Regions:
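C-terminal structural segment of proteins
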Residues: 1-167
Length: 167
């Protein structure tokens, strides 16, 4: 039986430097989960077989937050920078208006205030079937349950897909 909404036991580390973070990730490897905003993390922990022995919380690593002009004239945005900060940053607004506008349109204000750029770039698939433990293509199976006539597929891009239609 699948038990939902049960938070697994894990050890929490809260490094304050990138070097300490990398050392923890090197030590624990695949047993570690990186936490930034956490919007996706706890759903995965409660509702699927994603279990990690260690959670590395990046919230104390100041150097991973913020926006600054890069040496080459481009832009550097830290992985722990919230989407609200990206949307409202003067450098982004002035030089990368489309990025500012896009960040301002993601989800709700609450999610933009908590969600990070790194987390949004690296979040896992939103497919209801995949997240519920079905043995679909993405989970190693041989079928995409979202791409069937009776599927619950509201969150999927089902146009011109060849295997997995999840986004």
């Amino acid at each position: 039986a699948i038990v939902h909404d049960v938070m697994p036991v894990f050890e929490l580390f809260q490094p304050t430097t990138v070097d300490d973070t990398l050392a923890l990730l090197d030590t624990y490897g695949a047993d570690a989960w990186v936490l930034a905003g956490g919007l996706d993390t706890f759903d995965w922990f409660k509702d699927r077989n994603k279990r990690r022995k260690v959670v590395v919380d990046l919230s104390g690593v100041e150097s991973l937050r913020g926006v600054k002009k890069a040496a080459d004239g481009g832009l550097e945005i830290g992985a722990s920078t919230t989407l609200t900060d990206v949307a409202n940053d003067p450098l982004v607004k002035q030089n990368y208006r489309l990025l500012s506008q896009a960040a301002a349109l993601v989800a709700s204000p609450q999610i933009r205030n908590q969600g990070t750029l790194g987390g949004n770039v690296s979040q896992d698939t939103r497919c209801w079937y995949y997240r519920s433990g079905w043995t679909c293509y993405r989970a190693g199976g041989n079928i995409c349950y979202a791409d069937t006539p009776t599927a619950i597929n509201r969150e999927h891009a089902i146009f011109d897909a060849n295997r997995c239609v999840a986004v």
